[in-house]
A protein has these predicted regions:
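Short Gly/Thr/Asp-enriched flexible loops that form oxyanion-binding sites at enzyme active sites
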Residues: 6-14
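C-terminal substrate-binding/catalytic lobe of Rossmann-fold NAD(P)-dependent dehydrogenases
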Residues: 13-23, 28-198
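Conserved small/polar residues in nucleotide/adenosyl-binding loops
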Residues: 1-2
Length: 198
């Protein structure tokens, strides 16, 4: 079962619980994106803020450095487009598969770290001026179909997740965001056909 769809099913059948209490992890992808970007720039992961991974935990996801900062300064123009397109985006998206191919098993430690940091920031709050990626039922922001469990940038003050809103989205970003939304919609439709959202 697709993890985002597990979240969707729970949300569907527990309608009396607020939507923002249902999340699916994108933190493993978020952490991988930060790690790759930090290596490329030759800086510590802790120097980076505002990484975003839009969409699904799948090869259609969109790791996005548009808003990334290094020590508070814009970093997007520090990456060449070919590296982003040919290495960064596909390698972050396909990292899990690469690990399984090499090791014959998933990276349980990385997944556990993702779970720990997801829960820590949910309950203790995200650092001021930073955000993390969380998959939660869409409220329609950024043209993402409402109700679709989709990774978006979020902050937390310790009481729950708040979506980062009103970010400027380019046509190129929108196209990649649409592709991963369509992937999630096809997964949701498959779940519907199984009668799990009836």
């Amino acid at each position: 079962m697709y993890k985002r769809q597990n979240c969707l099913i729970l949300n569907h059948y527990a309608a009396d619980i607020p939507d923002d209490r249902f999340t699916a992890m994108m933190r493993l992808d978020h952490n991988r994106a930060l790690s790759m970007a930090s290596k490329k720039l030759g800086v510590a992961v802790s120097d980076l803020t505002n990484m975003t991974v839009w969409g699904n935990h799948a090869n259609t996801q969109f790791p996005d450095v548009t808003y990334l900062k290094v020590k508070g300064e814009a970093a997007a123009d520090k990456f060449d487009k070919s590296w982003l397109t040919d290495e960064f985006i596909p390698k972050v998206a396909m990292r899990g598969g690469e690990i399984i191919k090499v090791r014959g098993a998933s990276s349980a430690a990385s997944a556990a770290t993702g779970a720990i940091t997801h829960m820590r920031d949910w309950y203790q709050g995200t650092p001021k001026g930073d955000w993390v990626t969380v998959a939660l039922p869409s409220d329609g922001s950024y043209g993402i179909p409402e109700g679709l469990v989709y990774g978006v940038p979020c902050t937390s003050d310790g009481s729950g997740w708040q979506r980062v809103k009103d970010l400027e989205i380019s046509a190129a970003q929108a196209e990649r965001m649409k592709t991963t939304a369509e992937d999630l919609e096809s997964e949701r439709d498959a779940v519907k056909k199984l009668g799990l959202l009836g």
